[in-house]
Amino acid sequence: VENLLPIGNKGKSNGMQMPTFANAGSLDALAGYITLLADRLQVEDTLLAQEGVKYRTFPAVKIGLLAVDRRTKGLGVRLMEWAIDYVIAEVMPLVGVRFITVDALYDSDVEPAYDASGFYEKLGFEFADPTEPLPPVNPYRTMYLDLKPLIEVLATEQTG
């Protein structure tokens, strides 16, 4: 990750944020990018019933695309950290969102099968529907990250 250089924030003119990185040795070779877009998290049960919230649909920010060059160890985590920080600092003060969502790819057409959900689980994401079947019915599984615990930790660190 040390040899990566930010090469811009593509798409700012249309409101989409997309930080991009290139390898320091070759600025014309894209090392990774991430996109964010508006979404909603729909759940079968009331996700926040213990907090007295009875909704089944919640506004969210979706990780639309996340791509990294396999040679750039740690860039995927770095881009996700940027996205989480950006949503907390820039989006949440303006829009009522509490969740980040992603459709984690499960690709059974490659050997061995590729399951991106483990990457997102390490970052604290949970399955919106843990009983959702894997492919061939559906190659993506919706996952979410509740930002409230992160915000509470940040608030505690700032006051303590």
Features from the language model and the residues they span:
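Non-catalytic substrate-recognition and accessory regions of acyl/acetyltransferase enzymes
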Residues: V1-K73, V77-G160
